[in-house]
From Swiss-Prot:
Zn(2+) binds at H630, C632, E654, C715. This is 5-methyltetrahydropteroyltriglutamate--homocysteine methyltransferase. Disulfide bonds: none annotated. Belongs to the vitamin-B12 independent methionine synthase family. It comes from Staphylococcus haemolyticus (strain JCSC1435).
Amino acid sequence: MTTITTSNLGFPRLGRKREWKKAIESYWAKKIDKAELDQKISDLHRENLLLQKHYNLDSVPVGDFSLYDHILDTSLLFNIIPERFQGREVNDDLLFDIARGNKEHVASALIKWFNTNYHYIVPEWDNVEPKVNHNVLLDRFNYAKSLNVNAHPVIVGPITFVKLSKGGHQSFEEKVQTLLPLYKEVLQALVDAGAEYIQVDEPVLVTDESEAYEAITREAYDYFDKAGLADKLVIQTYFERANVKFLSSLPVGGLGLDFVHDNGYNLKQIESGDFDSSKTLYAGIIDGRNVWAADIEAKKKLIETLQGHAKHIVIQPSSSLLHVPVSLDDETLEQSIEEGLSFATEKLDELDALRRLFNQNDSAKYDKLKARYERFQSQSFKNLEYDFDSVPTSRKSPFPERKKAQDARLHLPDLPTTTIGSFPQTQEVRKYRADWKNKRISDEAYNNFLESEIARWIKIQEDIGLDVLVHGEFERNDMVEFFGEKLQGFLVTKFGWVQSYGSRAVKPPVIYGDVKWTEPLTVKETVYAQSLTDKPVKGMLTGPVTILNWSFERVDVPRKVVQDQIALAIDEEVLALEEAGIKVIQVDEPALREGLPLRSEYHEQYLADAVNSFKLATSSVQDETQIHTHMCYSQFGQIIHAIHELDADVISIETSRSHGDLIKDFEDINYDLGIGLGVYDIHSPRIPTEDEIATAIDRSLQQIDRSLFWVNPDCGLKTRKEDEVKDALTVLVNTVRKKRASNNQNKPA
């Protein structure tokens, strides 16, 4: 009979209560020294390893843990260091500077990890000298062994690593070939240290481009085979279906497949005989990306099916558990809903229940989880009726007519300036919000504080000279969680944190029921801010696509239905702001690109649904109300036409780390709506120079009509320090003023 063992692909770095984030940020703020940081991080790594061992995993991953990002770790391992940072000792401080930038150099680009809300640091190949630096992966493997944890190393594979890179004169194949001897050196050291197998992550092999990479993929793994490493390697895929027949033909010991997000195709290939049954099948059967409890009976049946096609099966999550919170243990949720949830440790418990059932005929834990799932499923969360057809999905007039009405109302100057929405969330801001949520201060005291911060920042913006202002979003912990707290159908957890990028953690709400707007969400603060200035203040909302993509979505209702329910709720808030006299309303969609399916066959429907939902949320307003949107952290080339179809009066896009790449996208489309391409990187503490901002503006104006162009930072300023914000915005405004003066001088008399 086929043996069943358990494994994991990766575990959350943050810690139950964000201990990882707090330690790293304390080091950045010089509140602790490097020795104390190392101790705190070592303690957390130890806790993670032992916690996974506690759930009886047969093999625990090492190499998934990182001080910032595992792709950046791989870059440093192989000396793929940006030219501007070369010549320094390869250590954690270098890692942080590459990721965040410093006063002398800009940070490396930050891009979404496939279709998730995690972000990786893009490796740069310009003028690099690849070699193996200190093998941190070996250190972590040996550390796990010292704790008596049976571990397997995890490393991103050469095909995926090169695909996620940029720069350099070499071809794709040449870069892979350059890395192969370095991978061999690292892998051999791990095998020599006793690694039973090594998880080689190759998620790029589930994308449309995977067929184009088959030749170089075979060359790479043939190389490892000739080095005697083949039996120790497991090619791990996730997030979509893979070409099982091709991957099974490679000389490796095992193949990891996603049986949750593959739309059923991986199972069909297995049943068709495409899997080489002499290899180990690493079956991703527990959802690594969502927080709902597994249908444990369905998983049992899936394993029984797979047993007919593989001699050895390892059951595991469908992807790294990096994308879900650590544990439900510290939550105080309504039991009827909590029974339907499963965070990282609960997912490991589900694996343990299945392992016990199959290997030991022990059904106690399985029966308990099955009963719990059935109790949750017996409830009904579909209670509301919606009339989607009653809300318009197009504006009353085309953009040229709307622009005339808006220009007449707003009286904005040439190259209008604005920010994206948020201002620094200082320790004081966070303390007041926490004290209010925990009922340590009154509503009146909290509202008085919010009004004082709003007033202070309205004055700061006026003094700097910005043209369209914002209230600062001091009442919001997160741009999605805030709406999750106020819309019906959402659940907000207490400790449900996940890593977004670097030390930035978000707490995605859980959508469990029908979504409904019940009262104004943002009107009070926005109207107060507008009362303090004659300049327009933007209403700040998050769009339906982003709210859905940055939440843990329900799975009992089609995705499009949930998205449109959210759109109707946002439409209600847009109208409430307009009725209150707000002239400019921004509906952010930073996650529109991130949700794009990895397979192009699904793109058209996804984008059509996304555009429809955005227009459902924004089309009820009058022509003179200016609708803005914002997008960030993404590669936009694939969706540039959909961006245009949103028909937003103004879109601001995060581009500072890859400005040239985005400008190229506009060469293929005559973009005839308002647009601001972010002119400096807010993720870095570095203050931009006037020359840098002027260059960014000039480059943009080569492709974009000046009358349509806005000047703004590339993202919200929530994570920056107050002085950094003031200094950077002052440089921005001063640069624009000089551009205006120069343009006026060049106009014919």
